């Protein structure tokens, strides 16, 4: 069983903000597959689906970003999912807008959602799909991540979602992190 987690903040206020890039990417994937998050448990919206013969949990925690680990930890424990079978999709401001990078474990890189997941899982050994949102020039980091993309940036971001969909499909199909990094990084 795989667990695909998208990070973001709940509520309409944050819906199109840079910090919700993970939610936007997973929502695109689910729309393309005709799936929806139809369950509410673990302080998260989730769906349990069969994709390409594999049982998959798709999840969007409904806590604020820095509490995301609670939902991920609870779901991983409940469904008995090994951290190596978890893929977390999240924003990364150390990369240009829409740039994608896969990592197999490692530190949080200062991302509070990832810090929370590491703390709740008790390990750094889970997979991440980072989506670039660019570092703010002179704007504060908090204000940058909590504002929407401008129309050109939004277009660029949405153009990357087809590749995100391929990465998710490959992960579900059992391609390991090394394969994904070699193919997509």
Swiss-Prot record:
Gene3D superfamilies: Peptidyl-tRNA hydrolase. It is found in: Cytoplasm. GO terms for biological process: protein quality control for misfolded or incompletely synthesized proteins; rescue of stalled ribosome. It is an enzyme of class 3 (hydrolase). It catalyses: an N-acyl-L-alpha-aminoacyl-tRNA + H2O = an N-acyl-L-amino acid + a tRNA + H(+). Keywords: Cytoplasm, Hydrolase, RNA-binding, tRNA-binding. Disulfide bonds: none annotated. It comes from the Bacteria. The keyword Electron transport does not apply. Monomer. Belongs to the PTH family. HAMAP family: Pept_tRNA_hydro_bact. This is Peptidyl-tRNA hydrolase. It comes from Lactobacillus delbrueckii subsp. bulgaricus (strain ATCC 11842 / DSM 20081 / BCRC 10696 / JCM 1002 / NBRC 13953 / NCIMB 11778 / NCTC 12712 / WDCM 00102 / Lb 14).
């Amino acid at each position: 069983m795989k667990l695909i987690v998208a990070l973001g903040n709940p509520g309409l206020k944050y819906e199109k903000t840079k910090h919700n890039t993970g939610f936007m990417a997973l929502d695109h994937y689910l729309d393309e597959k005709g799936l929806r998050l139809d369950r509410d448990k673990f302080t998260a919206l989730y769906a349990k689906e069969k994709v390409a013969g594999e049982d998959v949990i798709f999840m969007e925690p409904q806590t604020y970003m820095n509490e995301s680990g609670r939902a991920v930890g609870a779901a991983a424990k409940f469904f008995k999912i090994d951290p190596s079978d978890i893929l977390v999709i999240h924003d990364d401001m150390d990369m240009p807008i829409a740039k994608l990078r896969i990592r197999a474990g490692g530190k949080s890189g200062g991302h509070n959602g990832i810090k929370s997941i590491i703390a709740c899982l008790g390990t750094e050994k889970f997979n991440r799909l980072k989506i670039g949102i660019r570092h703010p020039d002179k704007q504060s980091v908090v204000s940058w991540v909590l504002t929407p993309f401008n129309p050109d940036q939004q277009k660029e971001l949405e153009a990357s979602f087809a590749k995100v969909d391929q990465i998710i499909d490959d992960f579900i199909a059992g391609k390991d992190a090394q394969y994904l990094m070699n193919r997509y990084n």
